[in-house]
Amino acid sequence: NYCNAGHMPPVITYPDRTCSFFDIQADLPLGILTDHSYPEYSYHFSPGSGILLYTDGVTEAENKERAFYTKERLLQIIHRNREQHPREFIKEIMKDIQSHVQAYEQSDDLTLFTLIYGEEWNLPRKK
């Protein structure tokens, strides 16, 4: 179950390794109204599907020409790296954002969180 308190639409990766933006109903950001009630929705993840949550600072990351990173570019990099381990998946997205913004200072946070449902990643443990 979930609700949306002003968040960006997550990206869902499916077991067939396609991906798309999740069709989510937008609502007010948390804290705007003290007595606002957020509707609750349900979603069932199939084993092997995943989700990427991100802040608006990702798609609104600007370069020196003041061009945004965009949702379309985010979806492209996700599609190219969807087979990666979640840790590497996030690193590749961050590298692509960095290549877009270069040294241009950002005024917003860049936060990404991903998970894969029902998959195990057997990686060596760090010592």
Give residue ranges: language-model regions.
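Conserved subregion of the PPM/PP2C metallophosphatase catalytic domain
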Residues: 1-127
